[in-house]
Structures are given as structure tokens and as C-alpha cells.
């Protein structure tokens, strides 16, 4: 319908309930999803200024717009799944420790700087924003994983002990002219089914710790950029393993 939710209304979805909201709303009360419930949001303004609490195995699915988890849109005590589908995108924060993320094709999730133990799956693109990022959870996506940085500034990305990342491709630094350090910790596994590029301009270092394993179909050590001589990325095998597929090393 054409109605809307206004005022200090609290929206509660009982256990197992399902609701789709496509209209913009202006309510300011809480939105609470009970265990097993699902709320599908098809309008960037559908939740008004509400804070959403995900309980149990509830699902909040966003099909359009840009979601910002850096604010208070998801309660930090949430334990369900945030699903991005359609053309939705979002930026999240490490404070949401209990949330699982599911990325549909053509969607993008950005991790702000911090340490993450979350489970992230799907077919979309995952981005680690500027700053130090540590992954202690499990990532399994068929899209690209990209690490962002500031031009001319060093950046660090770490896959924690026992953690795993599977992605269709990986770029350890998308920007140019700054050293990138990728740390694969003890017993961590990185599995890139396409091309693993440590840094676009070759100014990168990958450290693979004891028991750590990196698998890639193709390893790209990087190219010279803007006339600056770069020998390509450096890989340090500190008791770890590197296995390449038919694409070899370029």
C-alpha cells in the first residue's frame, strides 16, 4: 500500500514472521526481528531513523540503497544475518561482532578499519577500507576482495591465526605508491580461485606464517607505475606454503 510508519512506533517481527517494506517511513522507534524472522527492505528510507536489533537467526535483507553500519542502524547486540541483494551496498563496523553477512551478486560490503571475526559469504564484492584490518573469521565469496589505502601511505592487512578467506580474486592494494603488507598468520588459509595481486604497483610484501597456506590460480606480483621502478612484490615464506595453479606467476 501507500501508507507509512511514523512517530515513535516500535516495529516487532515475531519469531518466524516475514515482512517486506517498500515505502519510505519516518518512525524513530526500534525495529526488532525475532528468531527466524525476515525483514526485506526495498527502499533506502524504509526504516526511518530506527535502530534494528537482529535476534537469533533473523535476517535483514536490503535490496537497494546504501546501508551505513558506522552509525546506530544495527544494534551492537545483533546476532542475525545482514543480507545485501539487488544493487545494495553498505559499510559496516567491527563493533557488530555477532552479525553474519551475505552478499548477493552485484553488491558491495565495505569493512571499516578494525578487527573482524564475522562470517561473510556470497557472490558480491568485499572491500577493506583505509586503515589496519584484521580478519579472524571466515570469508567465502565468489566476487573480488579489495584492500583500500591512501596514495603514498603504507597499509597493513592480516588474516588471523586459523582464519580463512576464499574469493574469486584479491587485490592487496588498489591505490598506488605506498607499501602494502599482507600477513597470513599461523594455520590461516587464503584460497583465491582467480588472480591474487599483492599490490597493483608491485610495492607489496606478503608474509606467510608457519602452517599458513596461500593458494591462487594466478599470482600477479604487480607492475611498474608512472615510471617508478618497482621490482614486484616480495613473498616471505616463514614456514608457510604457496601453491599456484595453471596461471602461474606474472
Question: Which residues does each predicted region cover?
Answer:
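Parallel beta-helix/beta-solenoid
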Residues: 11-16, 105, 124-132
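Short aromatic-glycine motifs in intrinsically disordered, low-complexity regions
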Residues: 62, 107-110
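Extracellular/lumenal glycan-associated surfaces
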Residues: 185, 203-212
Amino acid at each position: 500500500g501507500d501508507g507509512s510508519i511514523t512517530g515513535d512506533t516500535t516495529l516487532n517481527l515475531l519469531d518466524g514472521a516475514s515482512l517486506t517494506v517498500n515505502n519510505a517511513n519516518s518512525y524513530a522507534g526500534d525495529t526488532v526481528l525475532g528468531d527466524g524472522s525476515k525483514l526485506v527492505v526495498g527502499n533506502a528510507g524504509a526504516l526511518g531513523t530506527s535502530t534494528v536489533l537482529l535476534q537469533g537467526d533473523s535476517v535483514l535483507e536490503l535490496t537497494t540503497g546504501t546501508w551505513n553500519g558506522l552509525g546506530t542502524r544495527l544494534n551492537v547486540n545483533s546476532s542475525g544475518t545482514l543480507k545485501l541483494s539487488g544493487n545494495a551496498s553498505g559499510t559496516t563496523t567491527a563493533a557488530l561482532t555477532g552479525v553474519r553477512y551475505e552478499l548477493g551478486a552485484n553488491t558491495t560490503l565495505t569493512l571499516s578499519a578494525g578487527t573482524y571475526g564475522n562470517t561473510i559469504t556470497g557472490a558480491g564484492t568485499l572491500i577493506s577500507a583505509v586503515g589496519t584490518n584484521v580478519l579472524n573469521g571466515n570469508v567465502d565469496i565468489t566476487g573480488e576482495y579489495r584492500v583500500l589505502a591512501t596514495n603514498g601511505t603504507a597499509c597493513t592487512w592480516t588474516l588471523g591465526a586459523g582464519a580463512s578467506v576464499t574469493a574469486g580474486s584479491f587485490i592487496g592494494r588498489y591505490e598506488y605508491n605506498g607499501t602494502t603488507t599482507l600477513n597470513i598468520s599461523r594455520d590461516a588459509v587464503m584460497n583465491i580461485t582467480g588472480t591474487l595481486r599483492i599490490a597493483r604497483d608491485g610495492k607489496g610484501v606478503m608474509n606467510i606464517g608457519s602452517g599458513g597456506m596461500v593458494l591462487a590460480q594466478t599470482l600477479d606480483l604487480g607492475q611498474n607505475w608512472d615510471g617508478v621502478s618497482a621490482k614486484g612484490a616480495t613473498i616471505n615464506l616463514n614456514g608457510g606454503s604457496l601453491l599456484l595453479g595453471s596461471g602461474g606467476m606474472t
